[in-house]
Amino acid sequence: MSNFTPDACNVDSGLDSVLPPSLYALVFTLGLPANLLALWAAWLQVRKGRELGVYLLNLSLSDLLLICALPPWTDYYLRRDVWGYGPGACRLFGFVFYTNLYVGAAFLSCVSADRYLAVAHPLRFPGARPIRSAAAVSALIWMLELAANAPPLLGEAIHRDRYNHTFCYESYPLSGRGAALANVGRVLAGFLLPWGVMMLCYAGLLRALRGSASCEQRERRRVRRLALGLPCVALLCYGPYHALLLLRSLVFLVGGGSVDAGGGCALEERLFPAYHASLALATLNCLADPALYCLACPGARGEVAKVVGGVVAWAMGKERRAWGERGGNGRGCGEGEEVGMVELRGNGREFVV
């Protein structure tokens, strides 16, 4: 079933067929292999009994779920906000997409908190960081996020208007006061709370590093980059979308919570292109997370390098065989030139904090 909105705002979908599909295609193409590799590397950390690997594994899993939901949303934007897969698919892909935006933010804050406890209080909270505790925290996050994002599944998934839009999981103006209040809650609990935790952990890590004489300068820089990178990535990726979502919701509530088109539509129509662009920008977090993983687990970089080196070696070996079958010299290069096969390895040391 769908809901027809007779007094809908006349939003312009002209830019929707350009920026969001381009970003989604980029995230899908690069993010899928990167997060599969990060998922495998995080699993290796879990097998070694490292609690940080649990959070990174769940972060990669969340990113992969979001990435897998992108193809139908790409088609939605290419059609200029016309959902063509029915209300059931809209609920499914909308739920997966929006839930994993907030699951990702929650696990970024877990990584920050874990690094803070490891550096600032390694002996004071020994029971807070075993792998079973990390698994319990992860399960709690999934349950809370799934429950918090479930209510929209019970309402109307699709909203049609007289401007030939078939919106999925969104409407312009907002569908009611309850939706506006829920949006404010998402901004506060789903974005600002995790981001605040990251900032507090960053400040605490800086204090702990200044007071530590045993930590090498190189490791100080790495921990500092990780501690700053987490809140910066969250702010740059999630911040614009949540700022516009909060603005839309507050204006709607201040205006009396009416769904009638009127003064509120002027704001909705102005914000619409930036709002959809900011939502697409939020998915770039799926590309940043694997890079942050390498900062969080320097020992795993060698494992990742081995896989990449193996793939490169396999590809180059395949090219050599193909060249030989075509009558070449079997080297895969020109005459008198050989390929130097480089085996990529880690630096042989790990710094576990």
UniProtKB/Swiss-Prot annotation:
Regulation: Activated by a network of residues, such as His-159, His-165 and His-276. His-159 is unique to Xenopus and contributes to the more acidic optimal pH range compared to mammals. These residues connect the extracellular-facing cavity to Glu-145, a conserved charged residue buried in the transmembrane core of the receptor.
Record keywords: Cell membrane, Disulfide bond, G-protein coupled receptor, Glycoprotein, Membrane, Receptor, Transducer, Transmembrane, Transmembrane helix
Site (Required for activation): 145
InterPro entries linked: GPCR_Rhodpsn, GPCR_Rhodpsn_7TM, GPR4_orph
Residues under site feature: Proton sensing: 159, 165, 276
Cytoplasmic side: 46-49, 122-129, 212-215, 297-353
Record's keyword annotation contains Glycoprotein: yes
Glycosylation sites recorded in the entry for this protein: 164
Topological domains, Extracellular: 1-8, 81-85, 157-172, 252-267
Domain notes for this protein: A multitude of proton-sensing residues, which include extracellular histidine residues or triad of buried acidic residues, contribute to activation of the G-protein coupled receptor activity and pH sensitivity.
Result of changing residue 122 to A: Decreased proton-induced G-protein coupled receptor activity
Family assignment from sequence similarity: Belongs to the G-protein coupled receptor 1 family.
Transmembrane intervals: 9-45, 50-80, 86-121, 130-156, 173-211, 216-251, 268-296
UniProt protein name: G-protein coupled receptor 4
Function: Proton-sensing G-protein coupled receptor activated by extracellular pH, which is required to monitor pH changes and generate adaptive reactions. Activated by an optimal pH of 6.0-6.6, a more acidic pH compared to mammals. Ligand binding causes a conformation change that triggers signaling via guanine nucleotide-binding proteins (G proteins) and modulates the activity of downstream effectors, such as adenylate cyclase. Gpr4 is mainly coupled to G(s) G proteins and mediates activation of adenylate cyclase activity.
Gene3D superfamilies the record matches: Rhodopsin 7-helix transmembrane proteins
Pfam families attached to this UniProt entry: 7tm_1
Gene Ontology CC terms, in alphabetical order: plasma membrane
Result of changing residue 165 to A: Decreased proton-induced G-protein coupled receptor activity
Disulfide bonds: 9-265, 90-168
Biological-process GO terms, alphabetical: adenylate cyclase-activating G protein-coupled receptor signaling pathway; cellular response to acidic pH
Positions of region (Extracellular loop 2 (ECL2)): 157-172
Topology relative to the membrane: Multi-pass membrane protein
Gene name as annotated: gpr4
Cellular localisation: Cell membrane
